[in-house]
Amino acid sequence: MSERVSARLRVTPCGSSTPAARRLISLRDAALSASQHGWPVLPGSVWRQSRYYNAITNASTNGLTPVVPRQHATVDRQQVRAWWQTLPHAVLLVTGKAFDVISVPMSWGISAAKHSMLRHDPAPMIVTPERMAHFLVTVPATLHVELPRWPRVVLAEPLSVVPAPPTRMDGNLVKWWITPNRTDWTPGDPALVQRALVATASGNAARET
């Protein structure tokens, strides 16, 4: 059963000039930017006192999760503004329509991103504090026949979520390794990303399982 906090979670007004308020504004701007480029978003749970909480119900959550149903993911600017006015704590990108996500251990993902194939034709890539790399690729994507040999290679199911910078996970920042601006907000070629992963799979990075 979910635990509940005793006090209502407070939201810092967006007009405030405190560091916390500036961080919330940066999260709102990240959500608006993603939605403007056709990437569906959802607000996520808040990290507080070493736990995640749903800012609507005050219940603790099992990790960083959406606080509204996944099927409500949207690119509507008005809805995004409304959500991040009261639920500004995390930005979650939702897979299946605008992009798919291929996830691998971070060091392997970085090795692949540095490979000549992706240096010339990069894919947006997120790295998380849990040391995972998430490549955003065009839909529909299917896994290369060799990649399922490594258990931590994951092709996200539709309506999966991936945290977008500057969201925090366990109190630490999620970051772009390859920003979407570098690719004109175009997801990468899934075949090319996977060829780069296969090409770098023999190194130590791929054995980080």
Enumerate the predicted regions with their spans.
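DNA replication initiation modules
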Residues: 139-209
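Catalytic core of tubulin tyrosine ligase-like
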Residues: 135
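Signature for HUH/AEP ssDNA processing cores
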Residues: 2-130, 140, 194, 198, ...
